[in-house]
């Protein structure tokens, strides 16, 4: 159904103005997080930028926000710390509240420790799960508790809250050599869907982005940026992702909750949930093991052996 003025929800607006809003962006010293922080600031948001201390020390993101977004009244505050530590998540929330309140969270921080599964160490597994999944959880939980408490005193029990969590197509596909990364990203998607269902009643919108972006973390995957003609943009430029994040963080996204988006160049793909391929029903009240074995064996004997739950078709589009 096409939205018109007569059927548009009262919560729906076209505005992406973030003046007066406070956002937290993790992994914001460089790459995608830096671009997202700048993008939100250009819309008027005050941004709490987070990264590890060494990355922030080498970053110009705070100065860049000050220079690029001064006309919008935005500013940036840096909070150094490991996002996998609860103390960092607590400090990020406290900083946002000190600036007027937490409105937007963009969880972006991440690392890779690629290795074939049979060679992967405990440390390589734990490090990736800690930064990606635990890091997302800690700040998401803090934001959820803050918004829920705030909603108790709000008119109509609703507040403005936007949660944008960064997953990956790896979590839908399961790439060889990235068992840790894929597991963490799949977990982030599930975490966000749970948050969306829990927080939607309070007016909070929680969504997932799966970006294809050329950053330092993905350099080994995507390589160096190509030469582009004047006026053109690299298909893997983080700026493509920023446009979607600006929307999802804004009042205009009030009706968007619990969704998964893939961003690649000028294309934004909305991903549908898994569908049922086939249901196998017993003739009686339960399956006889021999009959179930024969039924499943015969079905898979005529099926493409390369077809699995892995969403490989998404990678080809």
From Swiss-Prot:
Recorded catalytic activity of this chain's protein: (22S)-hydroxy-3-oxo-chol-4-ene-24-oyl-CoA + NAD(+) = 3,22-dioxochol-4-en-24-oyl-CoA + NADH + H(+)
GO BP annotations listed: cholesterol catabolic process; fatty acid beta-oxidation
Residues forming the catalytic site: 168, 181, 185
Gene ablation phenotype (knockout): Cells lacking this gene are shown to be highly attenuated in a mouse tuberculosis model. Required for growth on cholesterol.
Tagged with keyword NAD: yes
Function: A reversible dehydrogenase involved in cholesterol side-chain degradation. Catalyzes the oxidation of hydroxyl-cholesterol-CoA ester metabolic intermediate (22S)-HOCO-CoA (3-oxo-chol-4-ene-(22S)-hydroxy-24-oyl-CoA), the product of ChsH3, has no activity on (22R)-HOCO-CoA (the product of EchA19). Also acts on (3R)-hydroxyoctanoyl-CoA and 17-beta-hydroxyandrost-4-en-3-one, but not on 7-alpha-hydroxyandrost-4-en-3-one, uses NAD(+) but not NADP(+).
Matching PANTHER family: DEHYDROGENASES, SHORT CHAIN, SCP2 DOMAIN-CONTAINING PROTEIN
Family as reported in the entry's similarity comment: Belongs to the short-chain dehydrogenases/reductases (SDR) family.
Protein name as it appears in the record: Hydroxyacyl-CoA dehydrogenase ChsB1
Gene (name only): chsB1
